[in-house]
Curated annotation (Swiss-Prot):
Binds 1 zinc ion. Belongs to the NrdR family. This is Transcriptional repressor NrdR. Residues 49-139 form the ATP-cone domain.
Amino acid sequence: MRCPFCGNADTQVVDSRVSEEGDTIRRRRRCLSCDKRFTTYERVELAMPSVVKRDGSRTEYDAGKVRGSLSLALRKRPVSTDEVDSAVARIEETLLASGMREVPSEQIGELVMGELKRLDKVAYVRYASVYKSFEDIGEFVEAIREMQGPLLPGKKLRKD
């Protein structure tokens, strides 16, 4: 590590501490030439995978697009911004944990649907209708049935 004061490359680590979150190491260093001390921080830098679109083109992952998709589906629904941010973070953690360098956009769409299913069932059906390109009312009905899960014995769906 170069000294920020004199530019000398010979420095010595005097003290190292892990942050409370456990994701950063703080190091106190001393320059062996000018004897001045300085602090450095070390943390893992993880790269999000590239996104492979349906047409085969590739683009950088954009958390803003994921957040926008979630927010649009959740528009006028009782879900807080913090819950949306947490959903985006879970999607990103899943993508990073996969270790993949490239991920199909369809996989991100499925992750978004999973988060919406957990957050708000109406928003899930909204998103699914666009994402899966519903063509008729039957596809909406099927998505709603999927959300309701198995019927209890003796219960029937109303056909109104």
